[in-house]
Protein backbone atom coordinates (compact mmCIF):
# COMPACT_ATOMS: atom_id res chain seq x y z
CA UNK A 1 0.00 0.00 0.00
CA UNK A 2 2.77 2.44 0.99
CA UNK A 3 5.68 1.92 -1.39
CA UNK A 4 7.49 5.22 -0.93
CA UNK A 5 10.09 5.69 1.75
CA UNK A 6 8.28 7.88 4.27
CA UNK A 7 9.68 9.72 7.28
CA UNK A 8 8.06 12.06 9.74
CA UNK A 9 8.76 14.65 12.39
CA UNK A 10 6.33 14.52 15.29
CA UNK A 11 6.85 17.24 17.93
CA UNK A 12 4.65 17.87 20.95
CA UNK A 13 3.50 21.52 21.07
CA UNK A 14 4.21 21.97 24.77
CA UNK A 15 7.17 24.25 24.12
CA UNK A 16 9.05 25.88 21.28
CA UNK A 17 11.09 23.95 18.73
CA UNK A 18 14.47 23.04 20.21
CA UNK A 19 17.52 22.86 17.95
CA UNK A 20 17.79 19.15 18.81
CA UNK A 21 14.28 18.75 17.42
CA UNK A 22 15.21 20.70 14.31
CA UNK A 23 18.18 18.39 13.75
CA UNK A 24 15.84 15.38 13.98
CA UNK A 25 13.45 17.02 11.52
CA UNK A 26 16.34 17.81 9.17
CA UNK A 27 17.62 14.22 9.20
CA UNK A 28 14.13 12.91 8.38
CA UNK A 29 13.63 15.54 5.68
CA UNK A 30 16.96 14.81 3.98
CA UNK A 31 16.50 11.04 3.99
CA UNK A 32 13.06 11.36 2.41
CA UNK A 33 14.23 13.83 -0.23
CA UNK A 34 17.30 11.76 -1.12
CA UNK A 35 15.06 8.77 -1.85
CA UNK A 36 12.20 10.61 -3.56
CA UNK A 37 10.01 9.83 -0.56
CA UNK A 38 7.57 11.66 1.67
CA UNK A 39 8.40 13.79 4.69
CA UNK A 40 5.40 14.27 6.98
CA UNK A 41 4.73 16.65 9.86
CA UNK A 42 2.56 15.43 12.72
CA UNK A 43 1.72 17.52 15.78
CA UNK A 44 1.36 15.26 18.82
CA UNK A 45 -1.14 17.37 20.74
CA UNK A 46 -3.08 14.77 22.72
CA UNK A 47 -2.07 16.40 26.03
CA UNK A 48 -4.84 18.97 25.88
CA UNK A 49 -3.84 20.63 29.18
CA UNK A 50 -0.22 21.31 28.21
CA UNK A 51 -0.64 22.09 24.51
CA UNK A 52 0.09 25.60 23.30
CA UNK A 53 -1.27 27.07 20.07
CA UNK A 54 1.66 29.49 20.13
CA UNK A 55 4.09 26.56 20.26
CA UNK A 56 2.34 24.86 17.32
CA UNK A 57 2.53 28.09 15.34
CA UNK A 58 6.22 28.51 16.24
CA UNK A 59 7.04 24.98 15.04
CA UNK A 60 5.41 25.62 11.67
CA UNK A 61 7.09 29.05 11.41
CA UNK A 62 10.48 27.49 12.16
CA UNK A 63 9.94 24.96 9.37
CA UNK A 64 9.05 27.75 6.97
CA UNK A 65 12.07 29.85 7.98
CA UNK A 66 14.43 26.90 7.51
CA UNK A 67 12.90 25.87 4.19
CA UNK A 68 11.93 22.37 5.33
CA UNK A 69 8.83 21.68 3.28
CA UNK A 70 6.69 18.79 4.46
CA UNK A 71 4.44 16.77 2.17
CA UNK A 72 0.67 16.96 2.51
CA UNK A 73 -1.27 18.59 5.30
CA UNK A 74 -0.08 18.75 8.89
CA UNK A 75 -1.60 15.90 10.92
CA UNK A 76 -2.96 16.77 14.38
CA UNK A 77 -3.38 13.90 16.81
CA UNK A 78 -6.08 15.80 18.71
CA UNK A 79 -8.32 15.35 15.64
CA UNK A 80 -7.87 11.55 15.64
CA UNK A 81 -9.25 10.41 19.02
CA UNK A 82 -12.10 8.45 17.40
CA UNK A 83 -9.56 6.56 15.31
CA UNK A 84 -7.49 5.64 18.36
CA UNK A 85 -10.61 4.42 20.18
CA UNK A 86 -11.39 2.11 17.25
CA UNK A 87 -8.01 0.43 17.60
CA UNK A 88 -8.30 0.16 21.39
CA UNK A 89 -11.63 -1.62 20.81
CA UNK A 90 -10.03 -3.88 18.21
CA UNK A 91 -7.38 -5.05 20.69
CA UNK A 92 -10.00 -5.56 23.40
CA UNK A 93 -12.23 -7.56 21.04
CA UNK A 94 -9.29 -9.75 19.99
CA UNK A 95 -8.28 -10.43 23.60
CA UNK A 96 -4.94 -8.69 23.14
CA UNK A 97 -5.81 -5.95 25.64
CA UNK A 98 -7.99 -5.80 28.73
CA UNK A 99 -9.65 -3.48 31.21
CA UNK A 100 -7.73 -2.99 34.44
CA UNK A 101 -9.78 -1.92 37.47
CA UNK A 102 -6.90 -1.44 39.85
CA UNK A 103 -7.54 1.52 42.14
CA UNK A 104 -5.01 4.22 42.89
CA UNK A 105 -4.71 2.90 46.45
CA UNK A 106 -4.06 -0.66 45.25
CA UNK A 107 -1.39 0.57 42.86
CA UNK A 108 0.33 2.58 45.60
CA UNK A 109 0.23 -0.42 47.94
CA UNK A 110 1.76 -2.66 45.25
CA UNK A 111 4.55 -0.15 44.60
CA UNK A 112 5.33 0.15 48.31
CA UNK A 113 5.69 -3.64 48.60
CA UNK A 114 7.93 -3.80 45.54
CA UNK A 115 10.14 -0.98 46.80
CA UNK A 116 10.43 -2.66 50.22
CA UNK A 117 11.50 -5.86 48.46
CA UNK A 118 13.88 -3.82 46.27
CA UNK A 119 12.02 -4.93 43.16
CA UNK A 120 11.47 -2.81 40.07
CA UNK A 121 8.03 -1.12 40.31
CA UNK A 122 5.69 -2.77 37.81
CA UNK A 123 2.06 -3.72 37.39
CA UNK A 124 1.49 -7.31 38.52
CA UNK A 125 -1.08 -8.34 35.91
CA UNK A 126 -3.87 -9.04 38.40
CA UNK A 127 -6.63 -8.12 35.93
CA UNK A 128 -5.00 -9.79 32.91
CA UNK A 129 -7.40 -12.73 32.90
CA UNK A 130 -10.16 -11.17 35.00
CA UNK A 131 -13.67 -12.43 34.18
CA UNK A 132 -15.59 -11.44 37.30
CA UNK A 133 -17.85 -8.50 38.07
CA UNK A 134 -16.01 -5.18 37.72
CA UNK A 135 -15.54 -3.24 40.99
CA UNK A 136 -17.93 -0.34 41.54
CA UNK A 137 -16.75 3.25 41.22
CA UNK A 138 -13.58 2.48 39.25
CA UNK A 139 -13.06 3.89 35.76
CA UNK A 140 -10.76 1.28 34.19
CA UNK A 141 -7.66 1.83 32.12
CA UNK A 142 -6.90 -0.41 29.14
CA UNK A 143 -3.67 -2.43 29.21
CA UNK A 144 -1.97 -4.39 26.43
CA UNK A 145 -1.06 -8.03 27.05
CA UNK A 146 2.69 -7.62 26.74
CA UNK A 147 5.13 -10.54 26.51
CA UNK A 148 6.23 -11.70 29.96
CA UNK A 149 9.41 -13.43 28.87
CA UNK A 150 11.82 -13.64 25.95
CA UNK A 151 13.59 -10.86 24.11
CA UNK A 152 12.54 -7.99 21.90
CA UNK A 153 15.24 -7.54 19.27
CA UNK A 154 15.50 -5.01 16.47
CA UNK A 155 18.17 -3.68 14.12
CA UNK A 156 18.76 0.01 14.69
CA UNK A 157 20.26 1.96 11.78
CA UNK A 158 22.60 3.85 14.12
CA UNK A 159 23.18 1.58 17.10
CA UNK A 160 23.12 -1.81 15.38
CA UNK A 161 21.33 -4.75 16.99
CA UNK A 162 19.44 -3.76 20.15
CA UNK A 163 18.07 -6.33 22.62
CA UNK A 164 15.64 -5.89 25.48
CA UNK A 165 14.60 -8.64 27.90
CA UNK A 166 10.83 -8.42 28.20
CA UNK A 167 10.75 -9.21 31.91
CA UNK A 168 13.30 -6.47 32.64
CA UNK A 169 11.63 -3.60 30.87
CA UNK A 170 7.96 -4.32 30.45
CA UNK A 171 4.70 -4.94 32.23
CA UNK A 172 1.21 -4.80 30.74
CA UNK A 173 1.46 -1.11 29.99
CA UNK A 174 -1.50 1.23 29.60
CA UNK A 175 -2.73 2.10 26.10
CA UNK A 176 -5.84 4.08 27.14
CA UNK A 177 -6.29 6.06 30.34
CA UNK A 178 -9.38 5.94 32.56
CA UNK A 179 -10.83 9.00 30.77
CA UNK A 180 -10.48 7.20 27.43
CA UNK A 181 -7.53 9.24 26.12
CA UNK A 182 -4.83 7.15 24.42
CA UNK A 183 -1.23 7.04 25.62
CA UNK A 184 1.80 8.30 23.73
CA UNK A 185 3.19 4.96 22.57
CA UNK A 186 -0.20 3.82 21.32
CA UNK A 187 -0.94 6.93 19.24
CA UNK A 188 2.57 6.93 17.76
CA UNK A 189 2.19 3.37 16.50
CA UNK A 190 -1.29 3.93 15.05
CA UNK A 191 -0.25 7.11 13.27
CA UNK A 192 3.09 5.86 11.97
CA UNK A 193 1.42 2.75 10.59
CA UNK A 194 -1.58 4.47 9.00
CA UNK A 195 0.54 7.33 7.62
CA UNK A 196 2.84 4.81 5.95
CA UNK A 197 5.97 5.78 7.89
CA UNK A 198 8.70 3.38 6.82
CA UNK A 199 11.69 4.93 8.63
CA UNK A 200 11.74 6.59 12.05
CA UNK A 201 14.74 8.82 12.83
CA UNK A 202 14.54 10.20 16.36
CA UNK A 203 16.54 11.02 19.48
CA UNK A 204 17.86 8.12 21.52
CA UNK A 205 15.81 9.32 24.47
CA UNK A 206 13.05 7.38 22.66
CA UNK A 207 15.04 4.14 22.62
CA UNK A 208 13.25 2.77 25.70
CA UNK A 209 9.87 3.36 24.00
CA UNK A 210 10.81 1.19 21.04
CA UNK A 211 10.19 -2.29 22.56
CA UNK A 212 6.73 -1.19 23.72
CA UNK A 213 5.97 0.15 20.27
CA UNK A 214 7.16 -3.08 18.65
CA UNK A 215 4.76 -5.01 20.92
CA UNK A 216 1.93 -2.78 19.68
CA UNK A 217 2.92 -3.09 16.01
CA UNK A 218 2.83 -6.86 16.35
CA UNK A 219 -0.46 -6.91 18.27
CA UNK A 220 -2.11 -4.70 15.64
CA UNK A 221 -0.62 -6.59 12.69
CA UNK A 222 1.25 -3.56 11.36
CA UNK A 223 4.62 -3.60 9.63
CA UNK A 224 7.41 -2.44 11.93
CA UNK A 225 9.38 0.53 10.51
CA UNK A 226 13.15 0.86 10.50
CA UNK A 227 14.46 2.76 13.51
CA UNK A 228 17.41 5.15 13.76
CA UNK A 229 18.10 6.44 17.28
CA UNK A 230 20.37 9.49 17.27
CA UNK A 231 22.56 10.47 20.24
CA UNK A 232 21.83 13.73 22.02
CA UNK A 233 23.56 17.07 21.46
CA UNK A 234 25.80 18.03 24.37
CA UNK A 235 27.19 21.40 25.40
CA UNK A 236 30.91 22.04 25.28
CA UNK A 237 31.09 20.90 28.92
CA UNK A 238 29.83 17.44 27.91
CA UNK A 239 26.43 17.87 29.56
CA UNK A 240 23.06 17.72 27.82
CA UNK A 241 22.46 20.90 25.82
CA UNK A 242 20.38 23.44 27.73
CA UNK A 243 19.76 27.19 27.83
CA UNK A 244 22.88 27.75 29.93
CA UNK A 245 24.91 26.73 26.86
CA UNK A 246 23.20 29.39 24.73
CA UNK A 247 20.01 29.64 22.69
CA UNK A 248 18.02 26.45 22.25
CA UNK A 249 14.80 27.75 20.65
CA UNK A 250 15.19 27.70 16.86
CA UNK A 251 13.58 31.09 16.33
CA UNK A 252 16.01 32.68 18.81
CA UNK A 253 18.71 31.99 16.23
CA UNK A 254 16.75 33.95 13.65
CA UNK A 255 16.54 36.92 16.04
CA UNK A 256 20.30 36.60 16.68
CA UNK A 257 20.96 37.15 12.98
CA UNK A 258 21.85 33.55 12.15
CA UNK A 259 20.97 32.45 8.61
CA UNK A 260 18.88 29.27 8.26
CA UNK A 261 21.42 27.90 5.78
CA UNK A 262 24.13 28.21 8.43
CA UNK A 263 21.99 26.69 11.19
CA UNK A 264 21.00 23.67 9.07
CA UNK A 265 24.60 23.16 7.92
CA UNK A 266 25.73 23.37 11.55
CA UNK A 267 23.09 20.93 12.81
CA UNK A 268 23.58 18.28 10.15
CA UNK A 269 27.25 18.07 11.14
CA UNK A 270 26.31 17.45 14.79
CA UNK A 271 26.23 13.70 14.37
CA UNK A 272 26.88 13.14 10.65
CA UNK A 273 29.85 13.78 8.39
CA UNK A 274 30.95 13.39 4.80
CA UNK A 275 34.71 13.13 4.79
CA UNK A 276 36.31 16.34 6.00
CA UNK A 277 33.76 18.58 4.27
CA UNK A 278 32.32 21.33 6.45
CA UNK A 279 30.06 23.36 4.14
CA UNK A 280 26.92 21.83 2.63
CA UNK A 281 23.99 23.47 0.91
CA UNK A 282 20.56 21.94 1.42
CA UNK A 283 20.70 20.68 -2.17
CA UNK A 284 24.07 19.02 -1.47
CA UNK A 285 22.65 17.33 1.60
CA UNK A 286 19.64 15.96 -0.26
CA UNK A 287 22.10 13.96 -2.35
CA UNK A 288 24.67 13.05 0.31
CA UNK A 289 22.88 12.42 3.60
CA UNK A 290 22.73 8.83 4.82
CA UNK A 291 21.31 8.04 8.28
CA UNK A 292 23.33 4.82 8.40
CA UNK A 293 26.41 7.06 8.74
CA UNK A 294 25.13 8.94 11.81
CA UNK A 295 27.60 8.75 14.69
CA UNK A 296 26.74 6.56 17.66
CA UNK A 297 28.24 8.95 20.21
CA UNK A 298 26.85 12.29 21.36
CA UNK A 299 27.89 15.39 19.43
CA UNK A 300 29.22 18.61 20.94
CA UNK A 301 27.66 22.02 20.34
CA UNK A 302 30.31 24.49 19.19
CA UNK A 303 29.18 28.12 19.06
CA UNK A 304 32.36 29.20 17.24
CA UNK A 305 31.68 26.73 14.43
CA UNK A 306 28.15 28.11 14.00
CA UNK A 307 29.55 31.64 13.92
CA UNK A 308 32.11 30.60 11.30
CA UNK A 309 29.46 28.97 9.11
CA UNK A 310 27.18 31.99 9.43
CA UNK A 311 29.99 34.30 8.33
CA UNK A 312 30.64 31.99 5.37
CA UNK A 313 27.02 32.15 4.19
CA UNK A 314 26.85 35.93 4.70
CA UNK A 315 29.89 36.21 2.40
CA UNK A 316 28.58 33.86 -0.29
CA UNK A 317 24.78 34.06 -0.53
CA UNK A 318 23.33 36.37 -3.21
CA UNK A 319 22.03 39.82 -2.34
CA UNK A 320 18.38 38.79 -2.76
CA UNK A 321 18.63 35.98 -0.19
CA UNK A 322 20.55 38.07 2.36
CA UNK A 323 18.07 40.91 1.98
CA UNK A 324 15.10 38.53 2.34
CA UNK A 325 16.48 37.44 5.69
CA UNK A 326 17.22 41.05 6.66
CA UNK A 327 13.60 41.99 5.90
CA UNK A 328 12.47 39.31 8.35
CA UNK A 329 14.46 41.26 10.96
CA UNK A 330 12.77 44.52 9.92
CA UNK A 331 15.60 45.93 7.81
CA UNK A 332 15.51 46.41 4.03
CA UNK A 333 18.89 47.02 2.43
CA UNK A 334 17.34 47.60 -1.00
CA UNK A 335 15.98 51.04 -0.02
CA UNK A 336 19.52 52.43 -0.16
CA UNK A 337 21.33 53.56 -3.27
CA UNK A 338 24.17 51.25 -4.24
CA UNK A 339 22.69 48.57 -1.95
CA UNK A 340 24.68 45.77 -3.57
CA UNK A 341 27.93 47.67 -3.06
CA UNK A 342 26.94 48.40 0.54
CA UNK A 343 26.39 44.69 1.24
CA UNK A 344 29.71 43.80 -0.35
CA UNK A 345 31.36 46.42 1.87
CA UNK A 346 29.94 44.83 5.01
CA UNK A 347 29.73 41.12 4.37
CA UNK A 348 33.48 40.38 4.54
CA UNK A 349 33.65 41.11 8.27
CA UNK A 350 30.09 40.28 9.32
CA UNK A 351 29.42 37.31 11.58
CA UNK A 352 25.67 37.88 11.96
CA UNK A 353 22.98 39.78 10.08
CA UNK A 354 23.02 42.34 12.88
CA UNK A 355 26.57 43.19 11.86
CA UNK A 356 25.16 44.02 8.41
CA UNK A 357 22.31 46.06 9.88
CA UNK A 358 24.48 48.02 12.31
CA UNK A 359 27.23 48.49 9.74
CA UNK A 360 24.81 49.76 7.10
CA UNK A 361 23.27 52.25 9.52
CA UNK A 362 26.69 53.54 10.58
CA UNK A 363 27.74 54.15 6.97
CA UNK A 364 24.49 55.41 5.45
CA UNK A 365 23.52 57.70 8.32
CA UNK A 366 25.81 60.59 9.21
CA UNK A 367 27.01 60.07 12.80
CA UNK A 368 25.22 62.00 15.53
CA UNK A 369 27.71 60.89 18.14
CA UNK A 370 31.30 59.70 18.09
CA UNK A 371 32.77 56.79 20.02
CA UNK A 372 34.51 58.64 22.86
CA UNK A 373 37.00 55.85 23.50
CA UNK A 374 38.02 55.92 19.85
CA UNK A 375 38.31 59.71 19.90
CA UNK A 376 40.51 59.63 23.00
CA UNK A 377 42.71 56.94 21.49
CA UNK A 378 43.12 58.15 17.92
CA UNK A 379 42.41 61.90 17.75
CA UNK A 380 44.98 64.62 18.52
CA UNK A 381 45.80 68.13 17.32
CA UNK A 382 48.19 66.94 14.62
CA UNK A 383 45.87 64.45 12.95
CA UNK A 384 42.94 66.88 13.17
CA UNK A 385 45.00 69.28 11.06
CA UNK A 386 45.87 66.42 8.72
CA UNK A 387 42.18 65.50 8.45
CA UNK A 388 41.25 69.10 7.64
CA UNK A 389 43.88 69.25 4.88
CA UNK A 390 42.66 65.91 3.53
CA UNK A 391 39.07 67.16 3.29
CA UNK A 392 40.17 70.40 1.66
CA UNK A 393 42.00 68.59 -1.14
CA UNK A 394 39.37 65.91 -1.90
CA UNK A 395 38.05 66.66 -5.37
CA UNK A 396 36.81 64.23 -8.01
CA UNK A 397 37.75 60.76 -6.81
CA UNK A 398 35.27 58.01 -7.78
CA UNK A 399 36.50 54.51 -7.00
CA UNK A 400 38.15 52.98 -3.97
CA UNK A 401 41.35 52.78 -6.00
CA UNK A 402 41.07 56.51 -6.79
CA UNK A 403 40.73 57.30 -3.10
CA UNK A 404 43.60 54.99 -2.17
CA UNK A 405 45.95 56.53 -4.74
CA UNK A 406 44.92 60.04 -3.73
CA UNK A 407 45.44 59.28 -0.03
CA UNK A 408 48.89 57.78 -0.60
CA UNK A 409 49.97 60.83 -2.63
CA UNK A 410 48.52 63.15 0.00
CA UNK A 411 50.36 61.38 2.84
CA UNK A 412 53.63 61.36 0.91
CA UNK A 413 53.44 65.12 0.44
CA UNK A 414 52.60 65.63 4.10
CA UNK A 415 55.35 63.21 5.18
CA UNK A 416 52.75 61.29 7.20
CA UNK A 417 51.67 57.66 7.41
CA UNK A 418 48.32 55.98 6.83
CA UNK A 419 47.98 55.15 10.53
CA UNK A 420 47.96 58.90 11.24
CA UNK A 421 44.92 59.44 9.01
CA UNK A 422 42.92 56.22 8.57
CA UNK A 423 41.27 56.11 12.00
CA UNK A 424 40.44 59.85 12.08
CA UNK A 425 38.74 59.45 8.67
CA UNK A 426 36.89 56.37 9.88
CA UNK A 427 35.67 58.09 13.05
CA UNK A 428 34.61 61.21 11.14
CA UNK A 429 32.65 59.23 8.54
CA UNK A 430 31.02 56.54 10.72
CA UNK A 431 31.40 57.64 14.34
CA UNK A 432 33.40 54.52 15.11
CA UNK A 433 36.94 53.19 14.79
CA UNK A 434 35.56 49.98 13.26
CA UNK A 435 34.37 49.86 9.65
CA UNK A 436 35.08 48.18 6.30
CA UNK A 437 38.00 49.38 4.16
CA UNK A 438 38.19 53.13 4.53
CA UNK A 439 38.74 53.58 0.78
CA UNK A 440 35.56 51.64 -0.03
CA UNK A 441 33.61 53.69 2.53
CA UNK A 442 34.91 56.85 0.83
CA UNK A 443 33.80 55.45 -2.54
CA UNK A 444 30.34 54.57 -1.25
CA UNK A 445 29.73 57.98 0.35
CA UNK A 446 31.33 59.98 -2.50
CA UNK A 447 33.36 63.19 -2.18
CA UNK A 448 30.65 65.70 -1.20
CA UNK A 449 29.23 63.56 1.61
CA UNK A 450 32.72 62.71 2.87
CA UNK A 451 33.67 66.39 3.03
CA UNK A 452 30.43 67.23 4.84
CA UNK A 453 30.97 64.54 7.49
CA UNK A 454 34.60 65.45 8.06
CA UNK A 455 33.71 69.14 8.41
CA UNK A 456 30.97 68.27 10.90
CA UNK A 457 33.36 66.15 12.94
CA UNK A 458 35.96 68.93 12.98
CA UNK A 459 33.33 71.42 14.10
CA UNK A 460 32.17 69.12 16.93
CA UNK A 461 35.75 68.60 18.09
CA UNK A 462 36.31 72.36 18.33
CA UNK A 463 38.44 72.82 15.23
Curated annotation (Swiss-Prot):
<feature type="binding site">
    <location>
        <position position="243"/>
    </location>
    <ligand>
        <name>ATP</name>
    </ligand>
</feature>
<keyword id="KW-0547">Nucleotide-binding</keyword>
<keyword id="KW-0067">ATP-binding</keyword>
<dbReference type="GO" id="GO:0004818">
    <property type="term" value="F:glutamate-tRNA ligase activity"/>
</dbReference>
<comment type="similarity">
    <text>Belongs to the class-I aminoacyl-tRNA synthetase family. Glutamate--tRNA ligase type 1 subfamily.</text>
</comment>
<dbReference type="GO" id="GO:0005829">
    <property type="term" value="C:cytosol"/>
</dbReference>
<keyword id="KW-0963">Cytoplasm</keyword>
<dbReference type="InterPro" id="IPR020751">
    <property type="entry name" value="aa-tRNA-synth_I_codon-bd_sub2"/>
</dbReference>
<comment type="function">
    <text>Catalyzes the attachment of glutamate to tRNA(Glu) in a two-step reaction: glutamate is first activated by ATP to form Glu-AMP and then transferred to the acceptor end of tRNA(Glu).</text>
</comment>
<dbReference type="GO" id="GO:0000049">
    <property type="term" value="F:tRNA binding"/>
</dbReference>
<comment type="subunit">
    <text>Monomer.</text>
</comment>
<dbReference type="InterPro" id="IPR001412">
    <property type="entry name" value="aa-tRNA-synth_I_CS"/>
</dbReference>
<dbReference type="Pfam" id="PF00749">
    <property type="entry name" value="tRNA-synt_1c"/>
</dbReference>
<feature type="short sequence motif" description="'KMSKS' region">
    <location>
        <begin position="240"/>
        <end position="244"/>
    </location>
</feature>
<dbReference type="InterPro" id="IPR004527">
    <property type="entry name" value="Glu-tRNA-ligase_bac/mito"/>
</dbReference>
<dbReference type="Pfam" id="PF19269">
    <property type="entry name" value="Anticodon_2"/>
</dbReference>
<dbReference type="InterPro" id="IPR033910">
    <property type="entry name" value="GluRS_core"/>
</dbReference>
<keyword id="KW-0436">Ligase</keyword>
<feature type="short sequence motif" description="'HIGH' region">
    <location>
        <begin position="11"/>
        <end position="21"/>
    </location>
</feature>
<dbReference type="InterPro" id="IPR014729">
    <property type="entry name" value="Rossmann-like_a/b/a_fold"/>
</dbReference>
<protein>
    <recommendedName>
        <fullName>Glutamate--tRNA ligase 2</fullName>
        <ecNumber>6.1.1.17</ecNumber>
    </recommendedName>
</protein>
<dbReference type="InterPro" id="IPR020058">
    <property type="entry name" value="Glu/Gln-tRNA-synth_Ib_cat-dom"/>
</dbReference>
<dbReference type="GO" id="GO:0005524">
    <property type="term" value="F:ATP binding"/>
</dbReference>
<keyword id="KW-0030">Aminoacyl-tRNA synthetase</keyword>
<dbReference type="InterPro" id="IPR008925">
    <property type="entry name" value="aa_tRNA-synth_I_cd-bd_sf"/>
</dbReference>
<keyword id="KW-0648">Protein biosynthesis</keyword>
<dbReference type="InterPro" id="IPR049940">
    <property type="entry name" value="GluQ/Sye"/>
</dbReference>
<dbReference type="GO" id="GO:0006424">
    <property type="term" value="P:glutamyl-tRNA aminoacylation"/>
</dbReference>
<dbReference type="GO" id="GO:0008270">
    <property type="term" value="F:zinc ion binding"/>
</dbReference>
<dbReference type="InterPro" id="IPR045462">
    <property type="entry name" value="aa-tRNA-synth_I_cd-bd"/>
</dbReference>
<dbReference type="InterPro" id="IPR000924">
    <property type="entry name" value="Glu/Gln-tRNA-synth"/>
</dbReference>
Amino acid sequence: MHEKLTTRFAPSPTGYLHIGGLRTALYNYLYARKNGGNFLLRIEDTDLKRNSKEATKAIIEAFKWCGLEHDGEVTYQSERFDLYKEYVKKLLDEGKAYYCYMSKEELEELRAKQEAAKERPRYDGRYREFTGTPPQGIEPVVRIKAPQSGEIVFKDGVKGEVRFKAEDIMDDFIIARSDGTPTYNFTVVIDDALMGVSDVIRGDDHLSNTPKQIVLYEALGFKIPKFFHVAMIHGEDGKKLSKRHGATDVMEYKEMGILPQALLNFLVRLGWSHGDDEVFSLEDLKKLFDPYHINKSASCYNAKKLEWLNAHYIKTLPFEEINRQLKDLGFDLSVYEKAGFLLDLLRERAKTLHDIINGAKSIVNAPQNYDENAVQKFINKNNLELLQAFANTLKDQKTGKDFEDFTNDFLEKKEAKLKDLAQPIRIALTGSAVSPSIFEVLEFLEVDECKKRIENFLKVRGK
